[in-house]
C-alpha cells in the first residue's frame, strides 16, 4: 500500500522532472509517425522527386530508442541524488516504513516511465490508422519493447541506488552490471587463448554455439541499448521483463536491510567491498594483460600488462570502493 501523503511528497519533490520526462516520452512516438508523414507530403509537393511512399519503419529504431536515458535520470534523482545530498535521513524520519518509501519511489518513477509511453503508443496507433501509411515495420514490437526496456533500465538503476551510497557509485554499479556477462566470459576466454595459444570457440563448441545464437547479447542489459533486438522474435522481450523483476527484488530487499544512509561509502553493505575489490583487480589484470599482448604480440607484453593491470585495479578499487565520498 502506497501512502497518499508520501506519494504527494515524492511527486512535489521532482514534479518538473516527472512532467518534462512524461511529455518527452509521450510525444516521441506520435512525433515519429507525423514526421514520416510530413516527409512524405514534402516529397509529393516536389515535382523533381518520384516514387514517394509513406512508410513507418521502426526496424532501425527511432528517437524513442533513447528512452532509457530518461529512466536513468529519474532513478538517479529518486535515490542517488538524495543519498549524495544527505536528504534521505529526513525522509526516513517521516512516519513511513522503509518498504513504503521504496515502493512509493519505485512505482511513482515507474509510472512516469511506462504510462506516457503507453499513451504515446496509443496516439501513434491512432495516427497510423488515420494517415494510413502504405507499410508499417516493427511498430508494435518496437513500441512495446521500448516500454519494457526503459523500465528494465529504471529497475536496474533503482537496485544499484539501493545498494550504494552516492550517485557515482549508483551509476558505476549499474554500468558494471550491464556489461558483467561480457567481463565474466569474454575476458577469461581471451586470456585462455593467449596463455594456451588456442581458440576457445574451436575447443569448446558449445561456447561458439552460444555466441552464434545471439543469446549472449540479450542476456546482458547493454544488449538492448542497440537496435538488434528489434529484428528478433517478440519472445526476446521476456528476458528484460524477468531482469526487471530481479532488479526490483534486489532493490527492495537492499533498501529494507541497509540502514546507513549518510556513511558516504560506495556500498551500504560493507561485506560487498572486498569481493568487489577482488573482481575489479581481476578484471583489470585480465584486461590489461590481453591489451599488452595485443600491442606487443609477446608474452612479455602480456606479463607487463598483468602487472600494470594489478596496480591500476588496486588503485581504482581503493579510491572508488573504500574511499568515502563527501555529501553535497
Positions of PLM-derived features:
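Long, hydrophobic alpha-helical segments
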Residues: 58-81
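Alpha-helical transmembrane segments of multi-pass membrane proteins
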Residues: 25-38, 121
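Secretory targeting signals
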Residues: 49-57, 108-175, 179-189
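Terminal transmembrane helical anchor/hairpin motif
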Residues: 36-54, 182-275, 281-310, 315-327
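Aromatic- and glycine-rich beta-strand/loop motifs that create alpha-glucan
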Residues: 1-25
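Short alpha-helical transmembrane interface motifs in multi-pass membrane proteins
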Residues: 59, 69-72, 137-142, 235-236
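Helix-loop-helix units of permease transmembrane domains in multi-pass membrane transporters
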Residues: 78-114
Amino acid at each position: 500500500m502506497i501512502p497518499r501523503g508520501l506519494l504527494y511528497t515524492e511527486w512535489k519533490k521532482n514534479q518538473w522532472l516527472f512532467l518534462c520526462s512524461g511529455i518527452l516520452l509521450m510525444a516521441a512516438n506520435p512525433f515519429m509517425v507525423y514526421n514520416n508523414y510530413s516527409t512524405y507530403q514534402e516529397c509529393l509537393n516536389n515535382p523533381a522527386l518520384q516514387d514517394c511512399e509513406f512508410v513507418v519503419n521502426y526496424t532501425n529504431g527511432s528517437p524513442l530508442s533513447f528512452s532509457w536515458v530518461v529512466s536513468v535520470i529519474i532513478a538517479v534523482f529518486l535515490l542517488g541524488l538524495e543519498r549524495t545530498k544527505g536528504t534521505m535521513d529526513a525522509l526516513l524520519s517521516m512516519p513511513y516504513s522503509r518498504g513504503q518509501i521504496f515502493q512509493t519511489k519505485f512505482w511513482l518513477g515507474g509510472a512516469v516511465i511506462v504510462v506516457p509511453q503507453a499513451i504515446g503508443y496509443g496516439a501513434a496507433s491512432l495516427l497510423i490508422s488515420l494517415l494510413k501509411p502504405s507499410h508499417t515495420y516493427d511498430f508494435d514490437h518496437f513500441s512495446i519493447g521500448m516500454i519494457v526496456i526503459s523500465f528494465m533500465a529504471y529497475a536496474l538503476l533503482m537496485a544499484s541506488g539501493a545498494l550504494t551510497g552516492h550517485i557515482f557509485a549508483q551509476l558505476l554499479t549499474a554500468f558494471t552490471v550491464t556489461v558483467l556477462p561480457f567481463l565474466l566470459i569474454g575476458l577469461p576466454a581471451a586470456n585462455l587463448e593467449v596463455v594456451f595459444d588456442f581458440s576457445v570457440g574451436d575447443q569448446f563448441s558449445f561456447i561458439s554455439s552460444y555466441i552464434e545464437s545471439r543469446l549472449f547479447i540479450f542476456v546482458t542489459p547493454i544488449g538492448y541499448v542497440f537496435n538488434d533486438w528489434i529484428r528478433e522474435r517478440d519472445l526476446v522481450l521476456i528476458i528484460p521483463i524477468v531482469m526487471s523483476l530481479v532488479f526490483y527484488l534486489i532493490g527492495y530487499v537492499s533498501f529494507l536491510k541497509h540502514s546507513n544512509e549518510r556513511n558516504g561509502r560506495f556500498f551500504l553493505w560493507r561485506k560487498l567491498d572486498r569481493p568487489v575489490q577482488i573482481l575489479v583487480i581481476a578484471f583489470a589484470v585480465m584486461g590489461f594483460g590481453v591489451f599488452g599482448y595485443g600491442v606487443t604480440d609477446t608474452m612479455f607484453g602480456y606479463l607487463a600488462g598483468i602487472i600494470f593491470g594489478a596496480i591500476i585495479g588496486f588503485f581504482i578499487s581503493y579510491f572508488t570502493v573504500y574511499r568515502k565520498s563527501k555529501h553535497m
